Protein backbone atom coordinates (compact mmCIF):
# COMPACT_ATOMS: atom_id res chain seq x y z
CA UNK A 1 0.00 0.00 0.00
CA UNK A 2 1.19 3.56 -0.63
CA UNK A 3 -0.13 6.91 0.50
CA UNK A 4 -2.10 8.30 -2.42
CA UNK A 5 -3.47 11.66 -1.33
CA UNK A 6 -4.31 13.87 1.60
CA UNK A 7 -6.63 16.81 1.94
CA UNK A 8 -7.39 19.66 4.30
CA UNK A 9 -11.04 20.61 4.56
CA UNK A 10 -12.99 23.50 5.98
CA UNK A 11 -16.69 22.85 6.36
CA UNK A 12 -19.46 25.10 7.63
CA UNK A 13 -22.86 23.62 8.45
CA UNK A 14 -25.98 25.67 9.09
CA UNK A 15 -29.03 23.85 10.37
CA UNK A 16 -32.42 25.25 11.24
CA UNK A 17 -34.10 23.34 14.06
CA UNK A 18 -37.64 23.67 15.39
CA UNK A 19 -39.04 23.14 18.86
CA UNK A 20 -41.21 20.15 19.75
CA UNK A 21 -44.49 20.02 21.64
CA UNK A 22 -45.36 17.27 24.14
CA UNK A 23 -48.09 14.89 23.00
CA UNK A 24 -48.22 11.31 21.72
CA UNK A 25 -48.59 11.83 17.95
CA UNK A 26 -45.45 12.35 15.89
CA UNK A 27 -44.53 13.46 12.41
CA UNK A 28 -41.28 12.50 10.69
CA UNK A 29 -39.21 15.07 12.55
CA UNK A 30 -40.72 14.48 15.97
CA UNK A 31 -43.53 17.04 16.05
CA UNK A 32 -46.23 15.91 18.46
CA UNK A 33 -49.95 16.56 18.22
CA UNK A 34 -52.55 16.33 20.96
CA UNK A 35 -55.44 14.53 19.30
CA UNK A 36 -57.87 15.81 21.92
CA UNK A 37 -56.86 19.46 21.61
CA UNK A 38 -56.17 20.03 17.94
CA UNK A 39 -55.28 23.53 16.84
CA UNK A 40 -54.98 25.06 13.38
CA UNK A 41 -51.24 25.49 13.80
CA UNK A 42 -50.84 21.74 14.34
CA UNK A 43 -51.31 21.24 10.60
CA UNK A 44 -48.98 24.01 9.47
CA UNK A 45 -45.96 22.54 7.65
CA UNK A 46 -42.49 22.90 9.13
CA UNK A 47 -39.56 23.92 6.94
CA UNK A 48 -36.09 22.60 7.71
CA UNK A 49 -32.82 23.27 5.94
CA UNK A 50 -29.13 22.43 5.86
CA UNK A 51 -26.37 24.26 4.02
CA UNK A 52 -22.88 22.78 3.85
CA UNK A 53 -20.08 24.69 2.16
CA UNK A 54 -16.60 23.24 1.85
CA UNK A 55 -13.05 24.23 1.01
CA UNK A 56 -10.54 21.49 0.19
CA UNK A 57 -6.80 21.61 -0.39
CA UNK A 58 -5.17 18.57 -2.01
CA UNK A 59 -1.55 18.49 -0.88
CA UNK A 60 -0.27 16.03 -3.49
CA UNK A 61 -1.66 18.10 -6.36
CA UNK A 62 -1.11 21.44 -4.62
CA UNK A 63 -4.64 22.34 -5.74
CA UNK A 64 -7.78 23.55 -4.00
CA UNK A 65 -11.51 23.93 -4.59
CA UNK A 66 -14.65 25.43 -3.07
CA UNK A 67 -17.87 23.45 -3.11
CA UNK A 68 -21.48 23.65 -1.97
CA UNK A 69 -21.77 20.08 -0.76
CA UNK A 70 -25.42 20.30 0.31
CA UNK A 71 -28.25 22.81 0.16
CA UNK A 72 -31.16 20.78 1.50
CA UNK A 73 -34.70 21.96 2.12
CA UNK A 74 -37.40 19.75 3.60
CA UNK A 75 -41.07 20.20 4.41
CA UNK A 76 -42.73 18.07 7.06
CA UNK A 77 -46.13 18.10 8.67
CA UNK A 78 -49.36 16.30 9.44
CA UNK A 79 -52.60 16.08 7.48
CA UNK A 80 -54.19 14.06 10.32
CA UNK A 81 -52.94 13.27 13.82
CA UNK A 82 -51.88 9.82 12.58
CA UNK A 83 -50.76 10.81 9.06
CA UNK A 84 -47.48 12.68 8.50
CA UNK A 85 -45.49 13.54 5.39
CA UNK A 86 -42.04 14.64 4.32
CA UNK A 87 -40.57 16.03 1.10
CA UNK A 88 -36.86 16.83 0.89
CA UNK A 89 -34.78 18.12 -2.00
CA UNK A 90 -31.08 18.91 -2.27
CA UNK A 91 -30.57 21.95 -4.49
CA UNK A 92 -26.83 21.42 -4.69
CA UNK A 93 -25.50 17.92 -4.10
CA UNK A 94 -22.03 18.70 -5.47
CA UNK A 95 -23.75 20.94 -8.03
CA UNK A 96 -26.65 18.60 -8.87
CA UNK A 97 -30.31 18.86 -7.89
CA UNK A 98 -31.67 15.68 -6.30
CA UNK A 99 -35.05 14.72 -4.89
CA UNK A 100 -34.22 12.77 -1.74
CA UNK A 101 -37.34 12.00 0.28
CA UNK A 102 -41.01 12.03 -0.68
CA UNK A 103 -43.20 9.89 1.53
CA UNK A 104 -46.24 9.60 3.76
CA UNK A 105 -46.03 8.03 7.20
CA UNK A 106 -48.88 6.47 9.15
CA UNK A 107 -49.09 5.84 12.90
CA UNK A 108 -51.98 3.31 13.00
CA UNK A 109 -51.32 2.16 16.58
CA UNK A 110 -48.90 3.02 19.35
CA UNK A 111 -45.22 2.39 18.44
CA UNK A 112 -46.06 1.20 14.89
CA UNK A 113 -45.22 3.21 11.76
CA UNK A 114 -45.93 2.54 8.08
CA UNK A 115 -43.96 4.63 5.57
CA UNK A 116 -44.62 4.59 1.82
CA UNK A 117 -42.76 6.50 -0.87
CA UNK A 118 -39.17 7.47 -1.60
CA UNK A 119 -36.81 7.18 1.36
CA UNK A 120 -33.51 5.92 2.71
CA UNK A 121 -33.85 2.20 3.36
CA UNK A 122 -33.20 0.85 6.89
CA UNK A 123 -29.58 -0.28 6.65
CA UNK A 124 -26.36 0.58 8.58
CA UNK A 125 -25.78 3.28 11.20
CA UNK A 126 -23.68 5.89 9.45
CA UNK A 127 -25.57 5.93 6.14
CA UNK A 128 -28.72 6.99 7.99
CA UNK A 129 -27.20 10.21 9.28
CA UNK A 130 -28.34 13.41 7.63
CA UNK A 131 -25.61 15.96 6.77
CA UNK A 132 -26.14 17.93 9.99
CA UNK A 133 -25.78 14.74 12.05
CA UNK A 134 -22.45 13.68 10.56
CA UNK A 135 -19.31 13.94 12.63
CA UNK A 136 -16.80 14.55 9.83
CA UNK A 137 -16.57 16.77 6.75
CA UNK A 138 -16.72 13.71 4.49
CA UNK A 139 -18.93 10.69 5.04
CA UNK A 140 -17.46 7.26 5.73
CA UNK A 141 -17.05 4.77 2.88
CA UNK A 142 -19.94 2.77 4.34
CA UNK A 143 -22.20 5.83 4.28
CA UNK A 144 -21.18 7.08 0.82
CA UNK A 145 -20.10 4.14 -1.34
CA UNK A 146 -20.94 0.75 0.13
CA UNK A 147 -24.14 1.19 2.16
CA UNK A 148 -25.76 4.34 0.80
CA UNK A 149 -29.16 3.28 -0.58
CA UNK A 150 -32.28 5.35 -1.21
CA UNK A 151 -35.20 3.64 -2.91
CA UNK A 152 -38.94 3.63 -3.43
CA UNK A 153 -41.10 1.23 -1.45
CA UNK A 154 -42.76 0.66 1.91
CA UNK A 155 -41.19 0.37 5.38
CA UNK A 156 -42.69 -0.91 8.63
CA UNK A 157 -41.27 0.18 11.96
CA UNK A 158 -42.05 -1.03 15.46
CA UNK A 159 -40.67 -0.13 18.90
CA UNK A 160 -41.01 -2.20 22.05
CA UNK A 161 -39.28 -3.01 25.32
CA UNK A 162 -38.68 -0.96 28.45
CA UNK A 163 -35.58 -2.47 30.04
CA UNK A 164 -33.86 -2.77 26.65
CA UNK A 165 -35.71 -0.69 24.03
CA UNK A 166 -35.75 -2.36 20.61
CA UNK A 167 -36.54 -0.75 17.27
CA UNK A 168 -37.33 -2.98 14.28
CA UNK A 169 -37.54 -1.70 10.71
CA UNK A 170 -38.04 -3.59 7.48
CA UNK A 171 -39.45 -3.08 4.03
CA UNK A 172 -39.81 -3.98 0.37
CA UNK A 173 -38.40 -1.77 -2.40
CA UNK A 174 -37.99 -1.53 -6.15
CA UNK A 175 -34.27 -2.13 -5.90
CA UNK A 176 -33.52 0.13 -8.87
CA UNK A 177 -32.89 3.38 -6.99
CA UNK A 178 -34.65 6.71 -7.42
CA UNK A 179 -34.63 7.26 -11.17
CA UNK A 180 -36.10 4.05 -12.64
CA UNK A 181 -39.41 4.00 -10.80
CA UNK A 182 -41.53 3.01 -13.81
CA UNK A 183 -39.78 -0.34 -14.28
CA UNK A 184 -41.64 -3.56 -13.41
CA UNK A 185 -39.88 -6.01 -11.08
CA UNK A 186 -40.22 -9.75 -10.64
CA UNK A 187 -37.49 -10.07 -8.01
CA UNK A 188 -37.93 -9.23 -4.33
CA UNK A 189 -35.72 -6.47 -2.88
CA UNK A 190 -35.75 -5.97 0.86
CA UNK A 191 -33.91 -4.41 3.77
CA UNK A 192 -34.26 -4.85 7.53
CA UNK A 193 -32.65 -3.37 10.63
CA UNK A 194 -32.81 -4.02 14.37
CA UNK A 195 -31.52 -1.60 17.00
CA UNK A 196 -30.99 -2.40 20.68
CA UNK A 197 -30.41 0.34 23.26
CA UNK A 198 -28.60 -0.95 26.33
CA UNK A 199 -28.50 1.28 29.43
CA UNK A 200 -29.28 4.33 27.23
CA UNK A 201 -25.60 4.56 26.29
CA UNK A 202 -24.80 1.49 24.21
CA UNK A 203 -26.57 1.10 20.87
CA UNK A 204 -26.24 -2.09 18.82
CA UNK A 205 -27.56 -2.24 15.24
CA UNK A 206 -27.89 -5.29 12.98
CA UNK A 207 -28.87 -4.90 9.31
CA UNK A 208 -29.45 -7.04 6.25
CA UNK A 209 -30.19 -6.04 2.69
CA UNK A 210 -30.85 -7.94 -0.54
CA UNK A 211 -31.17 -6.17 -3.90
CA UNK A 212 -30.88 -7.05 -7.57
CA UNK A 213 -30.08 -3.90 -9.59
CA UNK A 214 -29.55 -5.86 -12.83
CA UNK A 215 -28.86 -9.57 -13.33
CA UNK A 216 -26.85 -10.27 -10.17
CA UNK A 217 -28.33 -10.39 -6.66
CA UNK A 218 -26.33 -8.58 -4.00
CA UNK A 219 -26.65 -9.45 -0.31
CA UNK A 220 -25.23 -7.15 2.38
CA UNK A 221 -24.86 -7.65 6.12
CA UNK A 222 -23.95 -4.96 8.64
CA UNK A 223 -23.22 -4.84 12.35
CA UNK A 224 -22.45 -1.65 14.22
CA UNK A 225 -22.43 -0.21 17.71
CA UNK A 226 -21.74 3.03 19.47
CA UNK A 227 -21.14 3.82 23.12
CA UNK A 228 -21.56 7.19 24.80
CA UNK A 229 -20.15 8.02 28.22
CA UNK A 230 -19.38 11.43 29.62
CA UNK A 231 -18.16 13.57 26.74
CA UNK A 232 -17.09 10.63 24.57
CA UNK A 233 -18.79 8.98 21.60
CA UNK A 234 -17.11 5.79 20.33
CA UNK A 235 -18.45 4.00 17.27
CA UNK A 236 -17.56 1.03 15.09
CA UNK A 237 -19.27 -0.59 12.11
CA UNK A 238 -18.54 -3.50 9.75
CA UNK A 239 -20.26 -4.26 6.44
CA UNK A 240 -19.97 -7.47 4.41
CA UNK A 241 -21.32 -7.73 0.86
CA UNK A 242 -21.63 -10.80 -1.38
CA UNK A 243 -22.59 -11.32 -5.03
CA UNK A 244 -24.62 -14.28 -6.31
CA UNK A 245 -22.77 -16.96 -8.31
CA UNK A 246 -19.43 -15.37 -7.35
CA UNK A 247 -20.05 -12.64 -9.91
CA UNK A 248 -17.67 -10.37 -7.99
CA UNK A 249 -15.33 -10.67 -5.02
CA UNK A 250 -16.87 -10.26 -1.58
CA UNK A 251 -16.68 -6.74 -0.18
CA UNK A 252 -15.53 -5.70 3.29
CA UNK A 253 -15.92 -2.21 4.76
CA UNK A 254 -15.09 -0.79 8.19
CA UNK A 255 -15.83 2.52 9.88
CA UNK A 256 -14.52 3.38 13.35
CA UNK A 257 -14.14 6.71 15.12
CA UNK A 258 -14.04 8.51 18.45
CA UNK A 259 -15.39 11.94 19.37
CA UNK A 260 -14.72 14.01 22.49
CA UNK A 261 -16.72 17.17 23.31
CA UNK A 262 -15.17 20.00 25.28
CA UNK A 263 -17.69 22.65 26.49
CA UNK A 264 -16.68 26.28 25.97
CA UNK A 265 -17.97 29.46 27.56
CA UNK A 266 -17.32 32.14 24.94
CA UNK A 267 -17.99 32.39 21.18
CA UNK A 268 -18.32 28.61 20.71
CA UNK A 269 -20.61 26.39 22.77
CA UNK A 270 -18.21 23.46 22.45
CA UNK A 271 -15.14 22.14 20.66
CA UNK A 272 -15.01 18.51 19.52
CA UNK A 273 -11.88 16.43 18.86
CA UNK A 274 -12.29 13.55 16.41
CA UNK A 275 -10.27 10.68 14.94
CA UNK A 276 -11.41 8.10 12.38
CA UNK A 277 -10.18 5.06 10.49
CA UNK A 278 -12.27 3.62 7.68
CA UNK A 279 -11.61 1.29 4.75
CA UNK A 280 -13.29 -0.64 1.97
CA UNK A 281 -12.26 -3.29 -0.52
CA UNK A 282 -13.11 -2.89 -4.20
CA UNK A 283 -16.81 -3.15 -5.01
CA UNK A 284 -19.26 -3.17 -7.91
CA UNK A 285 -22.66 -1.49 -7.73
CA UNK A 286 -24.15 -4.38 -9.74
CA UNK A 287 -24.97 -2.12 -12.68
CA UNK A 288 -21.57 -1.58 -14.34
CA UNK A 289 -20.95 -4.48 -16.73
CA UNK A 290 -18.08 -5.18 -19.12
CA UNK A 291 -19.65 -5.18 -22.59
CA UNK A 292 -17.23 -7.79 -23.93
CA UNK A 293 -17.23 -10.32 -21.08
CA UNK A 294 -20.56 -9.52 -19.40
CA UNK A 295 -18.83 -9.53 -16.00
CA UNK A 296 -19.39 -6.94 -13.30
CA UNK A 297 -16.81 -4.17 -13.27
CA UNK A 298 -15.37 -2.23 -10.35
CA UNK A 299 -17.10 1.04 -9.50
CA UNK A 300 -15.14 1.84 -6.31
CA UNK A 301 -11.57 0.72 -5.71
CA UNK A 302 -10.00 -0.55 -2.50
CA UNK A 303 -8.84 2.19 -0.13
CA UNK A 304 -7.95 3.05 3.45
CA UNK A 305 -8.27 6.44 5.14
CA UNK A 306 -7.21 8.12 8.36
CA UNK A 307 -8.99 11.31 9.43
CA UNK A 308 -8.32 13.75 12.24
CA UNK A 309 -10.39 16.80 12.98
CA UNK A 310 -11.68 19.54 15.24
CA UNK A 311 -15.26 20.84 15.18
CA UNK A 312 -16.31 24.21 16.62
CA UNK A 313 -20.02 24.46 17.44
CA UNK A 314 -21.56 27.93 17.62
CA UNK A 315 -25.17 27.43 18.68
CA UNK A 316 -27.59 24.92 20.15
CA UNK A 317 -30.87 26.41 18.90
CA UNK A 318 -29.61 26.64 15.31
CA UNK A 319 -26.82 24.17 14.82
CA UNK A 320 -23.81 25.86 13.25
CA UNK A 321 -20.56 23.89 12.99
CA UNK A 322 -17.13 24.78 11.69
CA UNK A 323 -15.25 21.57 10.86
CA UNK A 324 -11.52 21.33 10.23
CA UNK A 325 -10.47 17.90 8.92
CA UNK A 326 -7.22 16.41 7.70
CA UNK A 327 -7.43 13.19 5.67
CA UNK A 328 -4.88 10.73 4.33
CA UNK A 329 -5.91 8.16 1.73
CA UNK A 330 -4.09 4.93 0.96
CA UNK A 331 -4.67 3.10 -2.33
CA UNK A 332 -3.09 -0.05 -3.75
CA UNK A 333 -0.05 0.49 -6.00
CA UNK A 334 -1.93 -0.70 -9.07
Task: Give the residues covered by each predicted segment.
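Outer membrane beta-barrel
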Residues: 35-175, 186-188, 195-203, 257, ...
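Outer-membrane beta-barrel pore domains
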Residues: 24-26, 59-61, 80, 103-107, ...
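Hydrophobic alpha-helical segments, especially transmembrane helices
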Residues: 5-6, 119, 277, 324
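Cleavable N-terminal export/targeting peptides
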Residues: 1-31
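Short, histidine-centered active-site or binding-site loop motifs used for metal coordination
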Residues: 53, 172-176, 239-240, 326-328
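Generic cytosolic/nucleocytoplasmic N-terminal low-complexity/intrinsically disordered segments
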Residues: 3-4, 19, 31, 53, ...
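Active-site cleft segment of glycoside hydrolase catalytic domains centered on the general acid/base Glu
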Residues: 180-184
Amino acid sequence: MIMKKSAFMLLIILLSLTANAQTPYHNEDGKKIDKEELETKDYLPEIHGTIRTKFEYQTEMAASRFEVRNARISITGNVLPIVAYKAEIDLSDEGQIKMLDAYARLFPIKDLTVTAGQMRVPFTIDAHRSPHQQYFANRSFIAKQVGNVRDVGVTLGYKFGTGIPVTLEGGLYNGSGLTNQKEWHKEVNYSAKAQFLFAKKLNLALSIQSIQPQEVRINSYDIGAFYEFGRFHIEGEYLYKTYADNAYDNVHAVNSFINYDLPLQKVFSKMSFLARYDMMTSQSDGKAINEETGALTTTDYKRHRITGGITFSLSKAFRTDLRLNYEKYFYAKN
